[in-house]
Amino acid sequence: MQGGAVITKTSATKHLILRLGNTKDSQGGYDGYQNIVIDGGTWDYNYQCVADKDAPGGFVGFCIGHARNVTIKNATFLNNLKSHFLEFGGVKNARITGCTFSGYYKNYVGGGQECIQIDCCTDETNVFPQYRPYDGTTCEDFVVDGNVFSDVFSGVGTHSMMSGETYKRITVTNNTFHNIKKSLHRIYEL
C-alpha cells in the first residue's frame, strides 16, 4: 500500500475487513490461494463504530485459509472487537513481520483472542468454519518476527487442535509485547 494509506471499517456490523477468496470452493490443503503479499498501510477495525459491540461475538479482521506463501509486513492493525486481528487456517509458509497490533475493546472481560490466530481447517466447535473443505489442514512454516503487540489480550497462538494433526515449524521471535492482558503466546501440539 502507498505510504500513509489507511483503511477504516465504517460498517456498524460485525463483518470481516478482508476475506481471501471464495470460502466455499477452495482447493483444500495448501493449494487454494498462493503468493499473497500485504505490505504496509494502517488497517483500523474501528470497533467504536459497531452498533452492538456489547452483544456476544466480535469480528475477525483478516481471514485466510487453504493458502501458501502469505506475507503480511510493515502494517498497523488497530481497534479490534473481541476477536483476532489476523486468522489463518491451513496456511503453509506465512510470514508476519514488522507489524503493529494495538487496541482492543476495553469492556470485554472474556478476552483471550490472539492478535494472530493459527488454526486448522475444521468446522468442529466452530474453530475455523470459514473455508471449505474441512480437511483438517493445519498451519506449517510460520514466522512471526519483529512485531509490536500493545494493549491487547493475547499476542500469538491457537486454542484448537485436531487428533493426529499438529502445527509444524511455528517460529515467534524478536517481538515486543506491552500491556498484554492474558498471554503473549499459546500454541497447542507443536
Residue ranges with predicted function:
Residues Q2, A12, Y33, I38, ...:
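Parallel beta-helix/beta-solenoid
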Residues G4-A5, W43:
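Acidic glycine-/aspartate-rich tracts in secreted/extracellular proteins
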Residues V6-D39, Q48-R68, E87-G89:
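Extracellular beta-strand-rich solenoid/capping regions of secreted or surface-exposed proteins
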Residues T8-H15, Y47-K53, V60, L81-F88, ...:
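Short glycine/acidic-rich loop motifs that flank beta-strands on beta-rich extracellular proteins
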Residues G21-Q27, N126-Y134, H159-M162:
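Short, recurring structural edge motifs at helix starts
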Residues N22, D119-C121:
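Conserved donor-binding loop and adjoining core beta-sheet/short helix segment
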Residues G41-Y47, L78:
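Generic short beta-strand segments
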